[in-house]
């Protein structure tokens, strides 16, 4: 299949690799960007795959506490201009109130607010989407919002201040699991295979590569889990060590960031500004 300039551009942004390397990787995978990233990690052509899943949509994350649970809601729009619009925010908060009143599913929320959403789209001039709703149970909770774009709720057995600090850590460090032991075996095995191939591409024999990587897996599971990460407020200690000192535990967390996994369509800048001006006069 023909590789487009847009595909090459996306792969460059997500890996930091050169244009020719990206084009070559995409050609080898018939345009499969995710497979290209994995192959480039193995070959060392990419600086990192850490930019995968870059934020590519606008909107807001809202949080509200209910009876023994909290709700996190994501509502999207096309530009950050509309994300700050009072009509958009009023709509998002109305959806949040209904969600918090009874743990309403995303499908039911979308259906219930479809007519209101369509009217708002006509008024504002941008597409709007009630995208995600998440519920988290727990008697002891703390939440943290970083601007309008990141929302975190943490549950556990700890004082409110400790949980709040952990929530701030989750917002900044993006752990995927609570504990290293929570990382699924298939995730560990996939990373192990990637690391072994990287080591072998560096000239290490397979037996030595496997021994080297065995030690790296402990580091990997620590890096992707909350309790294994260095605490942002006290980097010489892990979050797990801080919790142990305080006699505290974290049982669960949810972190939402605006636009995760959404590819934002590139718009002509002049046309976008004109649309924003027109909307403001409506």
Curated annotation (Swiss-Prot):
It comes from the Bacteria. This is Elongation factor Ts. InterPro entries: EF-Ts_dimer_sf, Transl_elong_EFTs/EF1B, Transl_elong_EFTs/EF1B_dimer, Transl_elong_Ts_CS, UBA-like_sf. GO terms for molecular function: translation elongation factor activity. Associates with the EF-Tu.GDP complex and induces the exchange of GDP to GTP. It remains bound to the aminoacyl-tRNA.EF-Tu.GTP complex up to the GTP hydrolysis stage on the ribosome. GO terms for cellular component: cytoplasm. Belongs to the EF-Ts family. Residues 79-82 are annotated as: Involved in Mg(2+) ion dislocation from EF-Tu. PANTHER family: ELONGATION FACTOR TS, ELONGATION FACTOR TS, MITOCHONDRIAL. The keyword rRNA-binding does not apply. The keyword Cytoplasm applies. It is found in: Cytoplasm. Gene3D superfamilies: 1.10.286.20, DNA helicase RuvA subunit, C-terminal domain (1.10.8.10), Elongation factor Ts, dimerisation domain (3.30.479.20). Keywords: Cytoplasm, Elongation factor, Protein biosynthesis. It holds the Pfam family EF_TS. Its main location: cytoplasm.
